[in-house]
């Protein structure tokens, strides 16, 4: 598959087909090609000998998609940066990535960034003045060059830039289109922010098949009336989201085939799909196919998939996450470094062309997590699991990295920032489960000296500081204050004891 050429052919075959819709804004395939070509031409003329990644700032604006393609046509990887990411984190991404340019389809509220900022008005001028000009196709990202870089949580307090190459993305997109039986011209739900790699599961399968991306933003999600009004207008056929989002939608009785009569495929990734959620979806959308998938950001969105049927639900108390895509393979590694036999639990290791080339500017972290096996890149996921008859079962994290509401995070990073807050002497993050999956984060805090009369005021002050350093989804929901943190005999935090205390 020639990814960019496949997207561009729709500008010729169906130029007026809508490529992306967000609220009242939309772009056609013709506009997508013209504006991304114009942008790529401008980037190449401004930075002829430079291939540093480019930050793309915004939320769900159509310009985000134009900017992504403009970057890669000019030979630059893009870094999606959502509006919700705190200024301090944006600053660290800019410094780590070596980016020299930031493209924005909205107002940039972050100050003192070490990059050149191209505003929304600047972009409009570029689209106009460079209209009709085409970039040199030889300059476009290709092969093992980075296509995008997504920053994930890092245990040192610094985000890690996962480098996904053109070949990685082609491997994923080709597999998704074929294995999920995606058809030409379908409407795809775009629910995940672009800085979250779940969004890749809808963006590129939609664009290469001439589909329409129907974006819903965080403000819509916070107002169910607006959300369901948008869904009723959408005629979505391919649903891509975390299971948690679908579970929330299922609380609305009208969320069914009557609301979305042409629903064909549900694609889930990012967290465990509970059996009860899958059963309700089968009841409400009897004609739709439900796919459960698995994969870390470091392996390009997902590498396994399974069609969830009533028979599968009856057979397994906890759903398997699927069979591996044909060009990759899974190894289950025991602690001694040997391969575990069928049915035995160990660390999931992914091998093949979906695997990232590593973390940008972090050779030590890359060496720790990535390796070569039989001449192919391999990623040690840190996830526990086992394989039976080719079917992968996921058993949670081996370390303190978790997925909460679809977002992957390292508890050590949150603890790092929490301990740096005023009024905090010590802290441990305890993830609290509800059934099979994590429900929220609890911060167990040893407070420092303070003058607050009430605990809730202390909590508000700590949360205010955390909001300056971490995304909202990494802020603990509840706080508990103790005089000390329990320790094990070998001097480590006794997390098991803490968990038993807080859940007693």
From Swiss-Prot:
One Pfam family matching this protein: AMP-binding_C
Annotated InterPro entries: AA_adenyl_dom, AMP-bd_C, AMP-bd_C_sf, AMP-binding_CS, AMP-dep_synth/lig_dom, ANL_N_sf, DltA, DltA-like
Pathway in which this enzyme or protein is active: Cell wall biogenesis; lipoteichoic acid biosynthesis
Subcellular location: Cytoplasm
Cellular component, GO annotation: cytoplasm
EC nos: 6.2.1.54
Binding-site list for D-alanine: 197, 301, 492
Catalysed reactions, as listed in the record: holo-[D-alanyl-carrier protein] + D-alanine + ATP = D-alanyl-[D-alanyl-carrier protein] + AMP + diphosphate
CDD domains according to UniProt: DltA
Swiss-Prot/TrEMBL keywords: ATP-binding, Cytoplasm, Ligase, Nucleotide-binding
GO MF term set: ATP binding; D-alanine [D-alanyl carrier protein] ligase activity
Chief place of localization: cytoplasm
NCBIfam families hit by this protein: AA-adenyl-dom, D-ala-DACP-lig, PRK04813.1
PANTHER family from the UniProt entry: ENZYME, PUTATIVE (JCVI)-RELATED, PTHR45398
Protein name: D-alanine--D-alanyl carrier protein ligase
Organism the protein comes from: Bacillus cereus (strain Q1)
Gene from which the chain derives: dltA
